[in-house]
């Protein structure tokens, strides 16, 4: 399990930190990745498909997040403050 050092408590939900991945799926405009928390060494991201949460994951980069968009599994996330 990856551990992430917290940068701050800011949660971005409707911001510029939203990445569209419809070009990588048979997606609608409601498919996107949102960064929930930013850490020094990665991000916690939420994947939505058709407006519903698909899963949440910890990733080191936005590129890694985009590679995982087809993995529809729930994940437990642990944090190191």
Task: Label the model's feature ranges.
Residues 2-9, 47-81:
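Mixed-charge, Lys/Arg-enriched low-complexity segments
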Residues 30-54:
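Short aromatic-glycine-(Arg/Gly/Cys) micro-motifs in beta-strand/loop hairpins
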Residues 1-29:
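Negatively charged, low-complexity tracts enriched in Asp/Glu with abundant Ser/Thr
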Residues 29-30, 63:
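Low-complexity, intrinsically disordered regions enriched in charged/polar residues
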């Amino acid at each position: 399990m990856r551990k992430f050092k917290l940068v701050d408590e800011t949660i971005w939900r409707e911001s510029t930190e939203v990445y569209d991945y419809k070009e990588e799926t048979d997606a609608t405009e409601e498919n996107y990745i949102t960064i929930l928390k930013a850490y020094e060494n990665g991000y916690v991201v939420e994947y939505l498909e058709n407006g519903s949460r698909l899963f949440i994951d910890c990733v080191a980069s936005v590129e890694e997040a985009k590679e995982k968009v087809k993995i529809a599994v729930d994940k437990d996330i642990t944090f190191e403050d």
